[in-house]
UniProtKB/Swiss-Prot annotation:
Segments forming a coiled coil: none
Keyword tags: Cell membrane, Membrane, Transmembrane, Transmembrane helix
Family, similarity comment: Belongs to the UPF0132 family.
Keyword Thylakoid set for record: no
Transmembrane segments: 2-22, 32-52, 55-75
Record organism: Archaeoglobus fulgidus (strain ATCC 49558 / DSM 4304 / JCM 9628 / NBRC 100126 / VC-16)
Gene Ontology CC annotation, any one: plasma membrane
Name of the protein described by the UniProt record: UPF0132 membrane protein AF_0736
Membrane topology: Multi-pass membrane protein
Record localization: Cell membrane
Main location: membrane
Amino acid sequence: MCYTLGFVTGVLFLLFDRSPFVRFHAVQSTLTFSTITALVILLPVLPGGALLSRVVMAFSIILWAFCIVKASRGEAFKLPIFGDIAEEQLSLNYT
């Protein structure tokens, strides 16, 4: 559920859920999809950026579906970069 509306549901689950599994996915979702949203908004100002923005958007839809399926099955998975940052952020909050 943390991935349903991208970073929006990630923030909501981070605020209201205490399960370590859910909180990890909430942070990972927030970091991943807020970065992708920023890229999709900012890329079109660059030459050729509109096309690149569309590629990023297509990739994000595939990634979004992958994340929803994996998390709904209860599978623990880390996305490159963002998963490591999420783990680090959560460990800082619990120590």
